[in-house]
């Protein structure tokens, strides 16, 4: 490949950008699951997880013993390779135990958001058909309402008035492995996780990731952080049910002995206190939290001990020059590293790995190790070169196998050569830095959560006084974007903004709520009936500046 440009990584002969990072080593053994791969990595780490609120911890020895015991119990109750197991839980030090145990058997883990309603959970259960669910006492009613007969394992020890098939995780963890379990052969190509992501068409779809995808992701994380000297302690506030949380905290960082300090949910005071209390070195977060840290820097530094912290890892959206410089000014000893990835790419895609790279303001970073990129004109399909804007396509060992039971969505997102259409409009500059210009996908990014406009539009149209509706992302400094609705009322209706917002709020998770409504006489559409969201976004943002 002599024609690859040494700066940009661009190859003229096939119009492909190649990563400038050291390629990741992938294990040659085809029969290997991600749990075995992680547990076999040599490191000097002692404590794997700490519960930030109680101080309870799991050492690496205890973690792997627990994983083995739980896997044994699951095997005894009939969980086999290819079975799907649902996990509905806030962050906890036991979340990774469940994931690693399930995957070690060749069974498939599917996670869901604790904020989801019973109806939303029921949809995922219907689609993924789990044979067992892990959850907490508090969240049990949601699963019971969604699937009455699903066997349950409770992850806490609270008493529940429950009929039916309920076990306790703590009892499973105490059990001595029998040694009689016949281990099924698990291949790298077998499915490990089924995480739900809103794709280009808007409705939530199950992303099939293989053990190889996860091993590639683990190796990318180890390559990126594993060479640092000294003990690394990561704060985990990002949700573990999400690819960012699952990739880094339930799997990736364990491979080289990091300690993970787990917060059950994000709360600024708890997070800042935990940094000092547990001497955390690294803080992964999403842009709105970083902005809050800049805005409240004086009070934060006066109140909390942040002396141990040396790195902030930011994902979800690129950071502006103002935010990056503002953070550097307020926290001069802390470096910011950024990352870009999708559920469909197992959270891997691009990153900035040094302070120098992070000074390329607005970038999503350089292509991750062993990743290839293309910029494709979304209209003509022509493959473009450096500094030309088009849809970013990615190819590499962490790209998903496809969408679960959805060939149409798979073929429109993955081409026959394994290229993933990201749905992001980007360009790659002469030094190989990726810049995200816009989202071809119409997803709304609220505080790092994905909200599909199509889902909210379908819900609005069930209201008897609404004849048409469109939902768009409305820009907001605090949360990134929030859902705004354009509504056409039935003739004679005096339906108010408040009533519409309450109507939706009752039926969706809090992050999906509509936070602004405008009434119009008609929704602009193209000849094929597709909503012209760009036109509505222009109207909304120009009106907000008046």
From Swiss-Prot:
Pfam family, one: AMP-binding
Listed GO biological process terms: jasmonic acid biosynthetic process; response to bacterium; response to jasmonic acid; response to wounding
Gene3D superfamilies, sorted: 3.30.300.30, N-terminal domain of ligase-like (3.40.50.12780)
Residue positions binding CoA: 265, 447-448
InterPro entries reported in the protein's UniProt record: AMP-bd_C, AMP-bd_C_sf, AMP-binding_CS, AMP-dep_synth/lig_dom, ANL_N_sf
Co-factor(s): Mg(2+)
Motif range (Microbody targeting signal): 544-546
GO cellular component, one term: peroxisome
Tissue: Expressed at low levels in seedlings, cotyledons, leaves, hypocotyls and roots.
Recorded domain comment: Both substrate-binding domains (SBD1 and SBD2) are involved in the substrate recognition, and are sufficient to confer the substrate specificity.
Full protein name: Peroxisomal OPC-8:0-CoA ligase 1
Subcellular location: Peroxisome
Stated family: Belongs to the ATP-dependent AMP-binding enzyme family.
Enzyme category, top tier: ligase
UniProt EC number: 6.2.1.-
Chain residue ranges for the region called SBD1: 267-338
Residues bound to ATP: 197-201, 205, 338-339, 343, 424, 439, 530
Main subcellular localisation: other
Highest taxon in the source lineage: Eukaryota
Name of the encoding gene: 4CLL5
Keywords from the UniProt entry: ATP-binding, Jasmonic acid signaling pathway, Ligase, Magnesium, Nucleotide-binding, Peroxisome
């Amino acid at each position: 490949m002599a024609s690859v440009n040494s700066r940009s990584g661009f190859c003229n002969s096939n119009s492909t950008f190649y990563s400038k990072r050291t390629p990741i080593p992938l294990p040659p053994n085809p029969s290997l699951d991600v749990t075995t791969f992680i547990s076999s990595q040599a490191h000097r780490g002692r404590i794997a997880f700490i519960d930030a609120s109680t101080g309870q911890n799991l050492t690496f020895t205890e973690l792997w013993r627990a994983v083995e015991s739980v896997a044994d119990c699951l095997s005894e109750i009939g969980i086999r390779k290819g079975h799907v197991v649902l996990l509905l839980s806030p962050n906890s030090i036991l979340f990774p135990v469940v994931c690693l145990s399930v995957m070690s058997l060749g069974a498939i883990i599917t996670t869901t958001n604790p904020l989801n309603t019973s109806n939303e959970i029921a949809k995922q259960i219907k689609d993924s058909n789990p044979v067992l669910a892990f959850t907490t006492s508090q969240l049990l009613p949601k699963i019971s309402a969604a699937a009455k007969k699903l066997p349950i394992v409770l992850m806490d020890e609270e008493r529940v008035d429950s009929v039916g098939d309920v076990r306790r995780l703590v009892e499973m963890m105490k059990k001595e492995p029998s040694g009689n379990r016949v281990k099924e052969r698990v291949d790298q190509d077998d499915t490990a996780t089924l995480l739900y992501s809103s794709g280009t068409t808007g409705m939530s779809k199950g992303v099939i990731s293989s053990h190889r995808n996860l091993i590639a992701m683990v190796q990318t994380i180890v390559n990126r952080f594993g060479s640092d000297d000294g003990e690394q302690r990561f704060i985990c506030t990002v949700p573990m049910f999400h690819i960012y949380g699952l990739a880094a905290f339930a799997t990736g960082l364990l491979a080289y002995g990091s300690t993970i300090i787990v917060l059950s949910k994000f709360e600024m005071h708890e997070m800042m206190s935990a940094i000092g209390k547990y001497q955390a070195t690294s803080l992964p977060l999403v842009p709105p939290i970083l902005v809050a840290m800049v805005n409240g820097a004086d009070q934060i530094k006066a109140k909390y001990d942040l002396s141990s912290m040396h790195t902030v890892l930011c994902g979800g959206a690129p950071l502006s020059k103002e935010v990056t410089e503002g953070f550097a000014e307020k926290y001069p000893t802390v470096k910011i590293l950024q990352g870009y990835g999708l559920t469909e790419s197992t959270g891997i895609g691009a990153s900035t790995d040094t302070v120098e790279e992070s000074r390329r303001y607005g970038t999503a970073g350089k292509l991750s190790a062993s990743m290839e990129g293309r910029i494709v004109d979304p209209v003509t399909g022509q493959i473009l070169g450096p500094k030309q804007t088009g849809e970013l396509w990615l190819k590499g060992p962490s790209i998903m196998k496809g969408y679960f039971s959805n060939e149409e969505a798979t073929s429109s997102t993955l081409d026959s050569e394994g290229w993933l259409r990201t749905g992001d409009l980007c360009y790659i500059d002469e030094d190989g830095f990726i810049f995200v210009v816009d989202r071809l996908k119409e997803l709304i990014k609220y505080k790092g959560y994905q909200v599909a406009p199509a889902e909210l539009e379908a819900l609005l149209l069930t209201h008897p006084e609404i004849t048409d509706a469109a939902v768009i992302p409305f820009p907001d400094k605090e949360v990134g974007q929030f859902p705004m609705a354009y509504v056409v009322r039935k003739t004679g209706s005096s339906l108010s903004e408040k009533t519409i917002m309450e109507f939706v709020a009752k039926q969706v998770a809090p992050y999906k709520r509509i936070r602004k409504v405008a009434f119009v006489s008609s929704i602009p559409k193209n000849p094929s009936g597709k909503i012209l969201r760009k036109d509505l976004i222009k109207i909304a943002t120009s009106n907000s500046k008046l």
